[in-house]
Amino acid sequence: MNHSEQLKDVLAEGCIIRRLEDDIYSALPDLPHKHLYDRRAAAYDSVVSTWLYNRLMWGTSPLDYVAFARAASISHPAGRMLDAGCGSLLFTAQVYLASHRQVIAFDQSLQMLKRARARLIRLGGSVPERILLLQADLSNLVFRPGRFDTLLCMNVLHQFAGAAELIPKLSGLLVDGGQLYLTSLVSNGRYIGDRWLGTLYRTGEFVRPRSGVELRNLLEDTLGEEVSYRMKGNMAFATAGC
């Protein structure tokens, strides 16, 4: 089954797939698309990848994100996995290359997807047939319900005002018994992190910061079930069965 056939199996009926470049496809309309991160993809990666930035600003480490992604990847032996808002696969490329699962990784930024492709090639020599890179909009999900065994959405919710609407839509893409893995920055009384969250909110980078308790309540209200939830510094890590 080629890439187009694999994508048609999970995309909603009538959704048109376009091949943009080698190993990159799009489910967006055939119109010019400019995304905020197209202009800053390289700068974003160079900062966010560092131990110093994560430790100082958020009280975390890049290894925390890699470990969380690995937990999502090994949560099912072979089922299909969706990475929603995948960025450049900064913390996930090595995890996906080490897995045998089919992974569909989507982001609205074409430049981020190009960096994801380059990262996979640099680390693995090529983009495996089972890893599909798709340009798609998180605000307008184009996937069929019940098509994924695992869904990972890392570092997205703090940029998404309509999280209460998004979370159940993501959950609906999972098969019965599927697993949802989410991370988000939250305010929690940590001075440096909370101040920086406020700055990013005022500059329009993030939505209004949610507190750790607020996010936990939101997840429990929208998913309607027990959520495994923990915080490290300003980062919340949540897992839920659906």
What kind of region is each of these model predictions?
Residues L82-N140:
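Class I SAM-dependent methyltransferase SAM/SAH-binding core
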Residues N2-R19:
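Short acidic, Pro/Gly- and aromatic-enriched capping/linker segments at domain boundaries
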Residues N155-V156:
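Short catalytic micro-motifs in class I SAM-dependent methyltransferases
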Residues I16-S75, Q94:
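Conserved class I S-adenosyl-L-methionine
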Residues L152:
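A conserved beta-strand element that flanks and buttresses the S-adenosyl-L-methionine
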Residues A238-C242:
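C-terminal lobe and adjacent flexible extensions of AdoMet/dcAdoMet transferase-like proteins
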Residues A164-D176:
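A short glycine-rich, Lys/Arg-flanked "PGG" loop and its adjoining helix->strand segment in the class I
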Residues Y181-A236:
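C-terminal alpha-helical "lid/dimerization" subdomain adjacent to the S-adenosyl-L-methionine
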